[in-house]
């Protein structure tokens, strides 16, 4: 794929790491590529970061024809830059496109686009411990009509944001609350797709949890309101009597790349792993009896976020004395070591941008 590159005439500078939050600072450039039913994907380009123009009737603004991904670029100790399993993100992006009726991308072209814009803005990849360059690929429908039909015009874009360390004071466990009113998704819906509507619709429950003193919610299935599905924006895992249990991918849960990586790591260590239905009753019985030894959320942003307490109605149980568990810490250390290039990568997960 031929990508034209137009560089900015007013380059910015990477702020100090202690001034980096998440998603508030953006690099100098972005990638754009357009789609039309008659031309297919065309006009791949890296251009200066700036506003995007579209018709007020664009389908994304009215019917939510949008999907996105979240991934990172990491600065290695030798100064090089690498990605972590980017082909998994590209595959998931295409699955999301299929579900939302959006045009899919050639996987090689999508990866080339990501690597190219990261390479152009390579000087924006921070090097301090725990920092990274967050990558947000997204794809949206631009048909200039209010007619409700499949997408005939679209844009694929990639923007970049240098991000600070998620845990500035170490891995501090957080309390989470079982959500009993709202549901995130149902089988046959868009729960397995990474689309904006899933996240926007979750805000109300997240706000309620924070008002009650919790960090985020723990979602239950949308039919029986009985089975644990995932955290507010991440997958979840529980160590129960020595076995790591994580909700099965039933079609309403996001297929997390970090989740998949953790399962492969755990199995390589000989740790029993079960992907299955886990009822909230079973989970809280395990918490009450002490069988629940560790719990953590898992995803791209935090990698591992230990759960220190579980709330459900009038019940609230502390987990592992509100401390990060040994296995949670080991997973975090191994995953981040591979991502930042401080540990060997026996799985072939990393992808240099060169």
Regions found by a protein language model. Give the residues of each.
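Helix-start/capping segments and mature chain N-termini
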Residues: 1-117, 138, 145-354
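Extended, Lys/Arg-enriched charged tracts that mediate electrostatic binding to polyanionic substrates
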Residues: 126-136, 140
């Amino acid at each position: 794929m031929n990508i034209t590159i137009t560089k900015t005439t007013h380059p910015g500078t990477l702020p100090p790491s202690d001034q980096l939050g998440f998603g508030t600072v953006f690099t100098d450039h972005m990638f754009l590529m357009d789609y039309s039913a008659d031309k297919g994907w065309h006009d791949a380009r890296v251009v200066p970061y700036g506003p995007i123009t579209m018709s007020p009737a664009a389908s994304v603004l009215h019917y939510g024809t949008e999907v996105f991904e979240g991934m990172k670029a990491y600065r290695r100790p030798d100064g090089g830059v690498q990605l972590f399993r980017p082909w998994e993100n590209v595959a998931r992006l295409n699955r999301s496109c299929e579900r939302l009726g959006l045009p899919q991308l050639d996987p090689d072209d999508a990866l080339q686009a990501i690597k190219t814009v990261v390479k152009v803005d390579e000087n924006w990849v921070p090097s301090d411990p725990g920092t990274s360059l967050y990558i947000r690929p997204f794809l949206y429908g631009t048909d200039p009509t209010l007619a409700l039909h499949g997408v005939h015009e679209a844009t694929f874009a990639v923007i970049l944001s240098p991000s600070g360390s998620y845990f500035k004071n170490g891995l501090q466990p957080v309390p989470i609350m079982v959500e009993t009113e709202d549901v995130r998704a149902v089988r046959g819906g868009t729960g397995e797709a990474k689309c904006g509507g899933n996240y926007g619709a979750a805000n109300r429950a997240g706000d309620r949890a924070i008002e009650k003193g919790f960090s985020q919610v723990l979602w239950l299935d949308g039919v029986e309101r009985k089975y644990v599905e995932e955290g507010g924006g991440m997958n979840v895992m529980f160590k129960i009597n020595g076995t790591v249990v994580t909700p099965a991918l039933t079609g309403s849960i996001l297929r997390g790349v970090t989740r998949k990586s953790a399962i492969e790591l755990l199995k390589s260590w000989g740790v029993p792993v079960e992907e299955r239905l886990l009822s909230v009753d079973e989970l809280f019985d395990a918490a009450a009896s002490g069988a629940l030894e560790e719990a953590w959320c898992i995803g791209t942003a935090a990698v591992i976020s230990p759960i220190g307490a579980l709330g459900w109605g009038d019940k609230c149980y502390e987990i592992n004395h509100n401390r990060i568990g040994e296995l949670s810490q080991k997973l975090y250390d191994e995953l981040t070591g591979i991502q930042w290039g401080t540990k060997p990568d026996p799985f072939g997960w990393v992808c240099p941008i060169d």
